[in-house]
Amino acid sequence: MRTLWRWLGKGVAAAVALVLLYQLWIFAHVLWWIDHDPRSTAFMETGLARQQAKNRDAVLRHKWVPYDRISNNLKRAVVAAEDARFVEHAGFDVAGIQKAFQKNVKKGRLVAGGSTITQQLAKNLFLSGERSFLRKGQEVVITLMIESTWSKRRILEVYLNVIEWGNGIYGAEAASRRYYKKSAATLSRDQAARMAAMIPNPRWYENHRGSRLYQRRVVLIKRYMGSVAVPR
């Protein structure tokens, strides 16, 4: 029996060590990306694999642009659409989490996350798209890492450059070229609102921008984008 407990203890210790090593690996990347731009993300790699399963020659459309070369209209539209209190909180919107919790309890499963921009970025950079409490817990840890080391400006810059904006389309510049044949720096207020409205389900909205739901989102974003604060 003692031998069994000894081996069990060693197994638990090894598992804990592996978890800690994984957290250190993630934190090392977070620190590196303070002033180095991510070349790819977990979501990009998943998206590329999905496309190459249908066409092995498929490539992603993605071009990094610095924060100052992204329209203020798009920054405001995205913050208004996804996280109106972005500059105020430390990575978590308590009101949003409460609403998501109530929705999850009502459904009896994890269907909503109340995710802030930083939480979405954590997921995009490192995690899969599955919904589970374990993955949500890891998302929280990564969010804390990012918020404790990056400026809000850097968080929004990386977010705008890596999120999905359609099938195989990642980042503001590639999306702006795809939908409006222009640079992300020159997006108008209306164009920015329309791009921001796609974020919750970009591959669907890419071909359904005439839907009522999409149009309602655009109207709401345009109504509130002038009143939100964004990093300078």
From Swiss-Prot:
Classification via Pfam families: Transgly (PF00912)
Task: Report the superkingdom from the record.
Answer: Bacteria
**Localization per record:** Cell inner membrane
Which GO terms label this protein's molecular function in UniProt?
pentosyltransferase activity; peptidoglycan glycosyltransferase activity
Q: What NCBIfam families does the annotation carry?
A: mono_pep_trsgly
| HAMAP family reported for this sequence | PGT_MtgA
Q: Would you tell me the protein name for this molecule?
A: Biosynthetic peptidoglycan transglycosylase
Could you tell me which species this protein originates from? Thiobacillus denitrificans (strain ATCC 25259 / T1)
